[in-house]
């Protein structure tokens, strides 16, 4: 399914948040939506997801104009929004999480657990996953929780998935698991909007990019034609230079080394080295 958003405007009182913004997503395309905090990314995607309504502008799916007055209408049109804070219940099995709010029932009115498990298994088969639908969500690592959210979107027949900072709480191996799933979805013609500040990840997984700055679309194109430096410059509006800070004092021998330090759910995969005579900023 092809998406085009054209001339999208949105104001909150006197604050003009989106100024005639355009955005496009092709079938089976992973597009990075980039911008500093407050650039308008969330507002634009909340309009696509039916959470907000634009003041003006058009949303077209496969060339047909659409209006979404609620998230349910957006979802019915094939658009799923996976927020940064995952919407999963740890004390329920995977298959029940997959059907929250849309539980399948028998004629008797009781939950049809068998049918929900079967449908969940079919989605997992489509994605090449070996997860047991009856596994409790609390037993999953962060990457598989993200994958369960993606699976739920596919169960609802989503053709476009919006992912808001999907790798923020993931370790490098977990990120690779999620990226492997995204590559499969690309092959299955599912479009992905990938909202992220991690530009190296954008270069690795995305096909295209769109950059917003101060409510205006300032750049878009193919990822293969730009560098992370280019993307950062588009985002902030000026050249980004790296400065080496510090007192210049000579440091001594290594006194402390941390590698892959993790304490769920507070932090994970922390590396740190401290040397004698050094003041280390954290």
Enumerate the language-model features and the residues they cover.
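Glycine-rich phosphate-binding loops of nucleotide-dependent enzymes
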Residues: 1-282
């Amino acid at each position: 399914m092809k998406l085009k958003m054209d001339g999208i405007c949105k104001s909150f009182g006197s604050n003009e948040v989106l100024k005639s913004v355009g955005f496009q997503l092709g079938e089976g395309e992973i597009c990075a939506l980039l911008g500093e905090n407050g650039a308008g990314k969330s507002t634009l995607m909340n309009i696509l997801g039916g959470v907000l309504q634009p003041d003006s502008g058009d949303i077209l799916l496969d060339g047909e104009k659409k209006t979404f007055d609620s998230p349910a209408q957006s979802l019915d049109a094939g658009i799923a929004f996976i927020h940064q804070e995952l919407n999963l219940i740890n004390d329920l099995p995977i298959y029940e999480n997959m059907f929250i709010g849309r539980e399948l029932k028998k004629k008797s009115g009781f939950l049809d657990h068998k049918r929900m498990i079967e449908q969940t298994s079919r989605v997992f088969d489509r994605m090449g996953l070996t997860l047991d639908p009856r596994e409790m969500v609390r037993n999953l690592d962060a990457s598989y929780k993200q994958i369960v959210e993606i699976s739920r979107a596919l169960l609802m027949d989503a053709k476009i998935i919006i992912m808001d900072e999907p790798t923020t709480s993931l370790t490098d191996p977990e990120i690779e698991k999620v990226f492997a799933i995204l590559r499969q979805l690309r092959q299955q013609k599912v479009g992905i909007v990938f909202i992220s500040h991690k530009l190296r990840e954008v270069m690795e997984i995305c096909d295209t990019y769109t950059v917003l700055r101060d409510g205006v679309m300032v750049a878009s194109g193919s990822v293969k034609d730009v560098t992370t430096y280019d993307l950062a410059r588009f985002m902030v509006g000026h050249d980004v230079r790296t400065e080496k800070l510090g007192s210049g004092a000579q440091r001594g021998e290594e006194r402390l080394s941390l590698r892959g330090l993790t304490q769920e759910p507070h932090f994970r995969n922390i590396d740190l080295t401290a040397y004698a005579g050094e003041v280390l900023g954290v």
